Amino acid sequence: EMQRSLVGSEMCIRDRFKYVERFSHVMHIITDVEGKLRSDKTCFDALGSTLPAGTLSGAPKIRAMEIIDELEKTKRSTYGGAIGYISFNGNFDSCITIRTGVFKDGKAYIQAGGGIVYDSIPENEYQESINKASAVLRAIEEAGDIV
Protein backbone atom coordinates (compact mmCIF):
# COMPACT_ATOMS: atom_id res chain seq x y z
CA GLU A 1 0.00 0.00 0.00
CA MET A 2 2.72 2.44 0.97
CA GLN A 3 4.69 1.52 -2.14
CA ARG A 4 2.34 3.69 -4.25
CA SER A 5 3.94 6.79 -2.68
CA LEU A 6 7.56 5.65 -2.99
CA VAL A 7 10.24 5.91 -5.63
CA GLY A 8 10.39 2.66 -7.59
CA SER A 9 10.65 -0.25 -5.24
CA GLU A 10 12.89 1.56 -2.77
CA MET A 11 11.06 0.25 0.27
CA CYS A 12 13.15 -1.78 2.64
CA ILE A 13 12.68 -3.51 5.92
CA ARG A 14 15.31 -1.97 8.18
CA ASP A 15 15.55 -4.98 10.47
CA ARG A 16 15.63 -8.06 8.30
CA PHE A 17 13.44 -9.97 10.73
CA LYS A 18 10.39 -8.92 12.67
CA TYR A 19 10.84 -8.77 16.41
CA VAL A 20 8.46 -9.12 19.31
CA GLU A 21 8.01 -6.18 21.64
CA ARG A 22 6.39 -6.78 25.02
CA PHE A 23 3.99 -4.26 26.52
CA SER A 24 2.11 -4.27 29.83
CA HIS A 25 -0.80 -6.43 28.64
CA VAL A 26 0.09 -7.73 25.17
CA MET A 27 2.94 -8.46 22.76
CA HIS A 28 3.30 -7.11 19.21
CA ILE A 29 5.36 -8.14 16.23
CA ILE A 30 7.25 -5.05 15.07
CA THR A 31 8.75 -4.39 11.64
CA ASP A 32 10.47 -1.13 10.76
CA VAL A 33 9.97 -0.13 7.12
CA GLU A 34 11.72 2.70 5.29
CA GLY A 35 11.39 4.16 1.83
CA LYS A 36 12.11 7.24 -0.27
CA LEU A 37 9.06 9.31 -1.22
CA ARG A 38 8.43 10.16 -4.86
CA SER A 39 8.90 13.86 -5.58
CA ASP A 40 5.15 14.33 -6.16
CA LYS A 41 4.19 12.70 -2.83
CA THR A 42 4.26 13.82 0.80
CA CYS A 43 4.36 11.95 4.08
CA PHE A 44 0.59 12.48 4.20
CA ASP A 45 0.24 10.50 0.96
CA ALA A 46 2.33 7.67 2.41
CA LEU A 47 0.31 7.62 5.61
CA GLY A 48 -3.03 7.88 3.79
CA SER A 49 -2.16 4.94 1.55
CA THR A 50 -1.78 2.69 4.58
CA LEU A 51 -4.98 3.61 6.43
CA PRO A 52 -6.88 1.90 7.74
CA ALA A 53 -4.06 -0.42 8.66
CA GLY A 54 -4.39 -3.87 7.16
CA THR A 55 -3.74 -5.40 10.56
CA LEU A 56 -7.07 -3.88 11.67
CA SER A 57 -9.09 -4.18 8.48
CA GLY A 58 -8.03 -7.50 7.04
CA ALA A 59 -7.46 -8.36 3.41
CA PRO A 60 -8.38 -7.80 0.72
CA LYS A 61 -8.78 -4.39 2.32
CA ILE A 62 -11.74 -2.92 0.43
CA ARG A 63 -13.89 -6.05 0.79
CA ALA A 64 -12.83 -6.50 4.40
CA MET A 65 -13.88 -2.92 5.14
CA GLU A 66 -17.26 -3.54 3.49
CA ILE A 67 -17.79 -6.57 5.72
CA ILE A 68 -16.75 -4.57 8.81
CA ASP A 69 -19.26 -1.89 7.86
CA GLU A 70 -22.00 -4.51 7.50
CA LEU A 71 -21.27 -6.38 10.74
CA GLU A 72 -19.99 -3.91 13.33
CA LYS A 73 -22.76 -2.09 15.18
CA THR A 74 -20.52 0.75 16.37
CA LYS A 75 -18.36 2.90 14.11
CA ARG A 76 -14.66 2.71 14.88
CA SER A 77 -14.22 6.49 15.23
CA THR A 78 -10.57 7.13 16.15
CA TYR A 79 -9.92 3.41 16.70
CA GLY A 80 -7.66 2.22 13.92
CA GLY A 81 -6.70 5.73 12.85
CA ALA A 82 -3.33 7.29 13.54
CA ILE A 83 -1.62 9.71 15.89
CA GLY A 84 1.78 11.09 14.98
CA TYR A 85 4.07 14.02 14.44
CA ILE A 86 5.97 15.79 11.70
CA SER A 87 9.10 17.65 12.76
CA PHE A 88 10.50 20.78 11.17
CA ASN A 89 13.31 18.78 9.55
CA GLY A 90 10.77 16.54 7.78
CA ASN A 91 10.88 13.50 10.04
CA PHE A 92 7.55 11.79 10.40
CA ASP A 93 6.40 9.08 12.77
CA SER A 94 2.97 7.72 13.59
CA CYS A 95 1.23 4.92 15.41
CA ILE A 96 -2.14 3.24 15.11
CA THR A 97 -4.72 4.25 17.71
CA ILE A 98 -5.61 0.83 19.00
CA ARG A 99 -5.48 1.36 22.75
CA THR A 100 -7.18 4.68 23.16
CA GLY A 101 -10.13 5.82 25.21
CA VAL A 102 -12.54 8.43 23.93
CA PHE A 103 -14.31 10.45 26.60
CA LYS A 104 -17.74 11.92 25.89
CA ASP A 105 -20.50 13.09 28.23
CA GLY A 106 -18.75 11.68 31.29
CA LYS A 107 -18.26 8.22 29.79
CA ALA A 108 -15.17 6.49 28.46
CA TYR A 109 -15.52 4.50 25.24
CA ILE A 110 -12.93 1.82 24.56
CA GLN A 111 -12.67 -0.47 21.55
CA ALA A 112 -10.46 -3.54 21.28
CA GLY A 113 -10.22 -6.51 19.00
CA GLY A 114 -8.12 -9.40 17.78
CA GLY A 115 -7.22 -10.74 14.39
CA ILE A 116 -9.21 -13.75 13.24
CA VAL A 117 -7.34 -16.02 10.86
CA TYR A 118 -7.80 -19.59 9.63
CA ASP A 119 -6.29 -21.28 12.66
CA SER A 120 -7.49 -18.82 15.32
CA ILE A 121 -8.79 -20.19 18.58
CA PRO A 122 -11.91 -18.12 19.38
CA GLU A 123 -11.39 -18.21 23.15
CA ASN A 124 -7.80 -16.95 22.77
CA GLU A 125 -8.87 -14.13 20.46
CA TYR A 126 -11.57 -13.10 22.94
CA GLN A 127 -9.05 -13.10 25.81
CA GLU A 128 -6.63 -11.02 23.71
CA SER A 129 -9.37 -8.41 23.23
CA ILE A 130 -10.04 -8.38 26.98
CA ASN A 131 -6.31 -7.97 27.68
CA LYS A 132 -6.06 -5.05 25.27
CA ALA A 133 -9.07 -3.25 26.72
CA SER A 134 -7.94 -3.87 30.30
CA ALA A 135 -4.78 -1.82 29.76
CA VAL A 136 -6.88 1.25 28.93
CA LEU A 137 -9.32 0.55 31.76
CA ARG A 138 -6.45 0.29 34.23
CA ALA A 139 -4.97 3.58 33.02
CA ILE A 140 -8.35 5.28 33.51
CA GLU A 141 -8.66 3.82 37.02
CA GLU A 142 -5.15 4.96 37.95
CA ALA A 143 -5.77 8.44 36.55
CA GLY A 144 -8.98 8.62 38.59
CA ASP A 145 -6.99 7.87 41.74
CA ILE A 146 -4.66 10.78 40.98
CA VAL A 147 -7.23 13.39 39.94
Segments (PLM) and residue ranges:
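Compositionally biased, low-complexity linear motifs
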Residues: 10-18, 92-99
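Single conserved hydrophobic/aromatic residue that forms the stacking wall/gate
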Residues: 1-8, 12-13
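Conserved hydrophobic core element of enzyme catalytic domains
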Residues: 25-147
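Gly/Ser/Thr-rich active-site loops/lids in small-molecule metabolic enzymes
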Residues: 14-29
